[in-house]
Design a protein with these regions (language model features):
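Polytopic alpha-helical membrane proteins, predominantly small-molecule transporters/carriers
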Residues: 2-136
Length: 136
């Protein structure tokens, strides 16, 4: 059984709500990933060997940045599922790539990561693609 979805032709309040859910999901994904990175930076480089898997996993799970990052990521997933209940997956999914656009800037600002020409061009292409799909 196929759930009723709002198509781009049926834009209105329902579509605005769905897009809001998608954008909250994207933002939660970015914030969650940033917190995961902060937590892992505090832990340092890890190796997942058979003998250390459980202890390393426990250290990650009890790291407050990792824990909160995962919680925010999970909350974003709830908003994503709410969006999927309202719109076609083929319409919603490209919006998830907006996280790449936001992440490029956030990683540069928070972690002093370099923005190479290739990353910049790729991010612009993603942004243009999302714009085109949002207009369909």
């Amino acid at each position: 059984m196929r759930a009723a979805t709002i198509t781009s032709a049926g834009k209105g309040t329902g579509m605005k709500i769905a897009i809001t859910y998608i954008l909250i999901s994207v933002l939660a994904s970015v914030i969650g990933q940033l917190l995961l990175k902060v937590g892992m930076n505090k832990m340092g480089s890890i190796t997942l060997s058979a003998g250390q898997f459980l202890s390393t996993s426990w250290k990650m799970a009890t790291n407050p940045y990792v824990f909160i990052g995962l919680a925010i990521y999970l909350a974003g997933t709830v908003f994503w599922l709410a969006a999927l209940s309202r719109v076609d997956l083929s319409y919603a999914y490209p919006f998830a790539s907006l996280s790449y656009v936001v992440m490029l800037v956030a990683s540069w600002m928070m972690f002093d990561e370099k923005i190479t020409l290739g990353r910049l061009i790729g991010t612009v292409v993603i942004g243009l693609g999302v714009f085109l799909i949002s207009r369909s």
